[in-house]
Amino acid sequence: MNENEYISRLKARDIRPTALRLLILRTMAGFDRAFSLADLEEELDTVDKSTLFRTLTLFLAHHLVHGIDD
């Protein structure tokens, strides 16, 4: 998927595309299996954990991703 497709996905869900949101979405799309928050934290070790959590919460609220409570 190219950058414009990621931007379109965010805009389609009324999410403003920022560099960090695009980075997180690209990283999520790169997984070939289900992944956890810990997996994302490991992959995105330069991103603050609270920022990552807030972004995932935003994605969940706008139905860009779905979550599973464990």
What do the PLM-derived regions correspond to, one by one?
Residues I15, A29-D32:
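Short helix-capping/hinge SLiMs at alpha-helix to coil transitions
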Residues L52-H63:
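Basic amphipathic alpha-helical segments that dock to polyanions
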Residues V47-D48:
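Short coil turns linking two alpha-helices in DNA-binding domains
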